[in-house]
Amino acid sequence: MKTKYKKFKIDGLAQVYVEAKKLGYSRSYDSMCKRIRLMNMKPSIVKKSYPKSNWKAYKTTYPGEKVQIDIKYVPIESILFGPLDKRYYQITAIDEYTRKRVLSIVDEKSVTHTANFLETLEDEMGFKIKTVQTDNGREFVNESLEKESMFEIKLKELNIEYKRTRPYSPWQNGKVERSHRLDSEFYSRKKFLSYEEMIKSVKKNCSRYNNTARMVLEFKTPNMVLKEYKERVQYTKKSNKRDLFIFF
């Protein structure tokens, strides 16, 4: 178990548990976590504190019901090519139900790039999206909030509903925010010598995330959850002769 922890800890304890069970580990997940704490293998976690809010997250029931989107900086320390002042950004979309992610690297934090990101998002996710949720950044909405941005216009063209989080309330987009913490760990270990290397590495990181077991998914991967849902829908369609959902 110790060896599996060292190898897979970056993917989370759920993946450590799945890999350990493959070698015959018989203890429960909670028992494994306790053992890791006793071995001082897991660093203490400093919890963030937020102001009180009456907001409550609701549990989605199918892929595409709500997709969270956000954008983060690619650390300048990871970029060893091009002009020293050149910045890059990662646009992230995560489906709340399956936790499947789609990533894109752009060279500007702009509404043009986020709008373009939407054009292929449903194809890359593999299903129709009902709602997209973002914060109130200028890369998504106009500062005045009176005129629709390119991002909002593109959502309407795609027949996708749009929700914005309350200002200064990052926890309302918590799933994409938490996934960005994993990305920060990823970038902290990377030094890109070329743009092509960066794109290839980020694509590999996204694939690894979508194929890594998560405790919140009952030790399944995002792709496994999506596959199982599609199979249930196909079975229901054959039984009830009606469409419940649209997949690509």
Regions found by a protein language model. Give the residues of each.
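Residue-level detector of family-conserved "landmark" positions at structurally sensitive sites
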Residues: D30, V46, V132, T165, ...
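C-terminal domain-tail junction helix/linker
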Residues: L158-I160, R181-F248
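Residues in well-ordered alpha-helical elements
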Residues: A14, D30, T112, Y195-I199, ...
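Basic, flexible linker segments flanking DNA-binding modules
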Residues: M1-P75, S149-I153, L226-V233
